[in-house]
From Swiss-Prot:
Homodimer. It holds the Pfam family SPOUT_MTase. GO terms for cellular component: cytoplasm. It comes from Petrotoga mobilis (strain DSM 10674 / SJ95). Specifically methylates the pseudouridine at position 1915 (m3Psi1915) in 23S rRNA. This is Ribosomal RNA large subunit methyltransferase H. It comes from the Bacteria. S-adenosyl-L-methionine binds at residues 71, 104, 123-128. GO terms for molecular function: rRNA (pseudouridine-N3-)-methyltransferase activity.
């Protein structure tokens, strides 16, 4: 199963609506679980490195028996066809394992997580909020499934 694990709740109504819609469309092909982890305290009172390390500890429990893809603007970029090939190859070679897409919180990722990730993927060189990253990732996973099932993707 594929999981999207994100620090911080999805709050914006238009993002929530989009996420629900893509999860509904994707359900035709596969089940994707969205896991929203709570924020690690007050951003204004906690030093960034401690905050990020707390986020890392929340992610860490999902690492065993999983292929962990870290979303980060410094990761590898690919077009939708290459992403579909990567996703298909990863699902095939990771039988019985979860594929985790890890979306960081407001301060980004702890340095510790980069060594634990199996792959680092960039949605763009630009930085997105965690909400937009989740929505963009879901759109791409829907597109991937359309590509892998030889279906067109047009509106």
């Amino acid at each position: 199963m594929t999981r999207i694990i994100v620090v911080g709740p999805l709050k914006s109504p238009y993002i929530i609506d989009g996420v629900k819609q893509y999860l509904k469309w994707i359900k035709k092909f596969e089940r994707i679980e969205l896991i929203q982890l709570p924020l690690s305290g007050d951003l204004n009172k906690t030093p960034p490195s401690i905050y990020k390390d707390k986020d890392f500890k929340k992610f860490e429990k999902y690492f065993p028996d999983s292929f962990n893809v870290l979303l980060d603007e410094r990761g590898e970029q690919m077009d939708s066809v290459k992403f579909s090939e990567f996703y298909d190859r990863t699902k095939t070679s990771s039988q019985g394992k979860h594929i985790n897409f890890i979306v960081g919180g407001p301060l980004g990722h702890s340095d510790k997580i980069y060594n634990k990730a199996d792959y680092i993927l960039s949605l763009s060189k630009m930085t997105f909020t965690h909400e937009f990253a989740v929505l963009i990732l879901l759109e791409q996973l829907f597109r991937v499934n359309k590509i892998l099932h030889n279906e067109t993707y047009h509106y």
